[in-house]
Structures are given as C-alpha cells and as structure tokens.
Curated annotation (Swiss-Prot):
Protein known as: Hydroxylamine reductase
Any single GO CC term annotated in Swiss-Prot or TrEMBL for this entry: cytoplasm
Residues found modified as Cysteine persulfide: 401
Positions with a binding annotation for hybrid [4Fe-2O-2S] cluster: 239, 263, 307, 401, 429, 454, 489, 491
Gene coding for it: hcp
UniProt lineage: Bacteria, Pseudomonadati, Thermodesulfobacteriota, Desulfobacteria, Desulfobacterales
Function noted in UniProt: Catalyzes the reduction of hydroxylamine to form NH(3) and H(2)O.
C-alpha cells in the first residue's frame, strides 16, 4: 500500500504497511483499485459527454465510489470487492454507449476485467494500480491533488443528489479530471485542472447549500443542548441530513431519543428538525473521540458518512453500531439504501436502541451555532457597524477538520490568544477545538460564529464576498479576514481548492502541510497564493492581527 491522502499520514510522507487511520493494507489496495476502475469509467464517460450525452448512472457511481475512498468511510473488504465488480459493469455499459467515440489504444484501467475475487485482490496488489507508479513526483503530486479534491467534490455532490439536486457540469468535470490522470499533460494543463477542481468545489458546495436550505430551511441561531435525557437514544454521526430527517420521523413516538455527534451537530440549526421533541441535542465531541463517546452513549449508533474509526479491543458497542450509505464496517449491521420514492428502513436500529440504557451524562449546558450565510447576512448591518466602529478589528476563519495530533492544540490556543475584538468564523469539526470555550461576544455578536458542516465553508465564502461588496473593496484579500485552516481529509482539500479559486491568499494550513504536495507543487502554491504552514501561536496571532 501507499496512502498519503490524510493529514496524519506516517511521518508526513505516506503509510506503507498500515494506515495511521487504522486502514489495513488490503483495504487500502482495494480502494486504489476502485479509483483505478473509476478512471476507466471516466475515459468512456468523457468521450460520451463530448459526443453530447452525459451518463448519470456512471456519474452517480463515480461519486459514490470516490466518496467510499475518503478517509474513515469504508472498512469492509467484501463490500469494496462488490463495488469494484459493480464499477466494471458500469464501465462496460458506458463503453457500449460510447461506441466509436472512443478509439485508439486504451490504458489498462479501461480494459482490465475480472469477476473473480482472488483475481481482483491480485490486481489490487499490482504495480499499475499504485500511486507510486508515476516516477515524476511533481506529476504524481498534481494528479493526486486533483483526485483528492475530486473526492471532496464527489461527497458534496452525492449529498445534493440524495436531496434531488444535480448539475451535469459537476459530473462532467469529475469524469474529465479522472480521465486526465491517464494522460500525459503539461504541468500548466494539470494546474489548470486543479484550479477547475476548485471552481467545481464552489459549485458543488453551492448546490448542496441550495439543497439543504430548500429542503430543511436556513440554519438559524440555536442554543444546542449538550446534556442528556432519560430515554434510550440513537446517536447519529456523519453528514447526511436526509438520513437525519427519516430517522427523526421514524423514531417519533417510540420512546427513543435522537442525538447528533461530530459533524451532524449542525442538524440542530435547521428549522425543519426543531419540531421533534425527542431530538435532544448533541453528544460528545469530534470524530476521533468516538471510541469513548460511543461507549458512554450506551445506545445505538448510526454512521451516515465519515468519520468511522476502528473499534478498540475494550470497546463494547459493535453490536450497537449501524452503518448506512457509503459507510461500512466488518460485523456492523448495515441499513440498506432507500427504494425509489421511499425511505430507508431504520426499524432495526430503533429496535436495538429500545433495549439500551439511556446515555451517560458527560457534560451539561449549551453551545451556540447556526451562523450560516443567510443568518449572518440578516445581521449584516450590526456586523458592518461593529467593523466600522472598531468594535470588530478582524475576522479569523478557522474552518476545517479536527484530528488526533497533539499539535492541534494550536487551534485552541489561537482561539484563546486572539484579542477580544476578533471574531472566529468556523465550519466543520475544527470547531470542537474552541466551541465550548467561553470567548464571550462583541455587542451581542458571539466571538465564535459556527456556519455548520465542512461544506458550509461555502457560507464563509459568501459572507466574505458580501462584506467585500458592502465595503466597496476590489479584492477579497483587502478584507480584515485571516485564514487559519485545520485540515484532515479530502473534503478539506476541496474546500482549500475552492478558496484558492475564489482568490483567497495568505492561508495558514495546519497542523502540517499535505504530504501529497511535492516541494515543487508546494512552491507553486506558496508563490501564487502565499499558502503557509502554521507557526507558533504568538507569532501567528501577531501576524494575523497585522494583516499578514
């Protein structure tokens, strides 16, 4: 195996024996093969699209396959083998539709086929499937930066499609991007595709924002309970709001309460979910605390997307763990996909929850969130007045991911060290590093404004662009906004590329720069966008307050 897609990759170089995430070598190899098959699908899909037809079935498969390979999603090798077989069938179907639109010699990813599990496992171990097959580290870096950004785009696109919102331009780009990694392109062309991935990430996040808000209303300022009730419960983690909706509806009147965990916390901000009295609040912290949080919750647990981490030997919740969608785990029960026009059947997890003890209380009180673009723009006059009066000197965007590395205490310390005339704008699970601190407010405006899930980083971009307009500025970088971003997985890569496409410069990225950036590619990003690693808390806070 060779995997360097997440921030915690071994020695910030790459995992070669077992993933730091816990991913076994065989699982990593099968995920590589699934991407390899997707490249073959994309070759035919791109040609078909150029001829005037976009194959949505193939596009849907590519989105879900890319999503499957995001860190902390897929753990079951048998499921991955089935996905590979399904991908080969999809590829054959697209190939038949493309017909003479594809000609000439084709790469192995467009022709290799097998239905035999042993042969599939052997292929997953072959050199041609490895990332490291490309000897030129700069080409490899640009290809992987593109693919990893596409994984984030695919995840957001899949969520939007579940709610009935789709754009063929996004699907077409994913095929173009994957197909491009099988071609000999110039460095300039590859950089162009990486920037197009940023543009597509903006489009995907905008589409998902439209899907979520049209379906569930605009997030609003909300005090979220972090204590517990007296009934048994279901803890729902991940990002899928459709699953949240159906679970709340099916648990109503059953005596089973529902709590969010991790990135599902922002579900508490949506008006549509507030009518459910058995929706109690949020339990626990960010994803990497789940071994402890899931244990003390006592009830049933539903993983709708990443992040699911391996169960430890002393954990007892495996028989209470349920997965759904693209998530899977060996030995865990799985809730199947919804039938066309229907809902998922959550009765197995509801019945399991009824047999469980109520959650153990681990904290009490409330946290405040719901500051997506619609809510913040409703407060625009108040915010603008605070900036003009000097009450707010600077905004610091601290969106992104949380993770296990001790060095991530930097983000807590920055939040604590920032002057009291600064406001933190956040989205994603990075918020858990500071959203329970008592940082106060500025004239009634909380000093931590949580927009929501990682995809709601789109809201932070909308807010910045609106402030640019209000203050009559020509450049988004002239705003009193600094960016101190925490990254972990591939959705954060998509968000980073989106910010770069929007012209944002001077982003601090930590706790380490990505291992998949070669020195040359990292140099390009530094020269063109002034991306920089994090430094010491004192130095970075001083620099940000000076607009550097």
């Amino acid at each position: 195996m060779f995997c360097f897609q997440c921030q915690e990759t071994a020695k910030n170089q790459g995992c070669t024996v077992k993933g730091v995430c816990g991913k076994p070598e065989e699982t990593a190899d099968l995920q590589d093969l699934l991407i390899y098959v997707c490249k073959g699908i994309a070759i035919y899909g791109e040609a078909l699209n150029a001829a005037g037809t976009l194959d949505r079935e193939a596009a849907h498969f590519i989105c879900r396959a890319l999503f499957t390979t995001i860190t902390n999603v897929a753990w079951d090798d048998d499921v991955l083998v089935d996905r590979i077989k399904e991908g080969l069938a999809v590829r054959d179907a697209v190939k038949a539709k493309a017909g003479e639109a594809v000609s000439g010699s084709l790469p192995d990813c467009a022709t290799w086929a097998s239905e035999d599990k042993a042969a599939i496992m052997a292929k997953a171990l072959s050199d041609e499937v490895r990332i490291t097959t490309m000897a030129n580290e700069d080409v490899r870096s640009l290809r992987e930066l593109l693919i990893l950004g596409c994984k984030g785009v695919a995840a957001y696109t899949d969520h939007a499609a579940i709610l009935g919102y789709e754009k063929d331009d996004i699907y077409a780009f994913l095929m173009e991007a994957l197909a491009s990694t099988t071609k000999e392109l110039s460095v300039d062309d590859m950089i162009g595709l990486v920037m197009k991935a940023g543009e597509t990430a903006v489009a995907a996040m905008a589409l998902l924002d439209e899907a979520n808000t049209a379906t569930y209303g605009h997030p609003e300022i909300t005090e979220v309970n972090i204590g517990v009730g007296k009934n048994p419960g279901i803890l729902i983690s991940g990002h899928d709001l459709k699953d949240m909706e159906e679970l709340l509806r099916q648990t109503e009147g059953t005596g089973v309460d529902v709590y969010t965990h991790g990135e599902m916390l922002p579900a508490n901000y949506y008006p549509a979910f507030k009518k459910y009295s058995h929706f109690i609040g949020n339990y626990g912290g960010s994803w990497w605390h789940q071994n402890k949080d899931f244990e003390s919750f006592n009830g049933a647990i539903l993983l709708t997307t990443n992040c699911l981490i391996p169960i430890k030997g002393d954990n007892t919740y495996k028989d209470r763990l349920f997965t759904t969608g693209v998530v899977n785990y060996p030995g865990a029960a799985h809730i199947g996909d919804r039938p066309d026009g229907g809902a998922k059947d959550f009765s197995p997890i509801i019945e399991r929850a009824k047999t469980c003890a109520p959650p153990t209380e681990i904290e009490t009180g409330t946290i405040v969130g719901g500051f997506a673009h619609h809510q913040v723009l409703a407060l625009a006059d108040k915010v603008v007045d605070a900036v003009k009066s000097g009450a707010i000197k600077r905004f610091v965007v601290m969106a992104g991911c949380d993770g296990r590395m001790k060095s991530r205490s930097y983000f807590t310390e920055v939040a604590e060290a920032l002057p009291k005339d600064t406001v933190i704008l956040t989205a994603g699970c990075a918020k858990y590093r500071y959203n329970k601190l008592n940082l106060g407010d500025i004239g009634g405006i909380p000093r931590v404004l949580d927009a929501g899930q990682c995809n709601d980083s789109y809201s932070l971009a909308v807010i910045a662009l609106k402030l640019k307009e209000v203050f009559g500025l020509a450049d988004i970088n002239d705003l009193p906004i600094s960016y101190d971003i925490a990254w972990y997985e591939q959705k954060a890569v998509a968000v980073l590329l989106a910010l770069l496409f929007l012209g944002v410069k001077g982003i601090r990225l930590g706790p380490t720069l990505p291992a998949f950036l070669s020195p040359t590619v990292a140099g390009v990003l530094v020269d063109k966008f002034d991306i920089k690693p994090i430094g010491t808390v004192a130095d970075d806070v001083a620099a940000m307050m000076a607009g550097k």
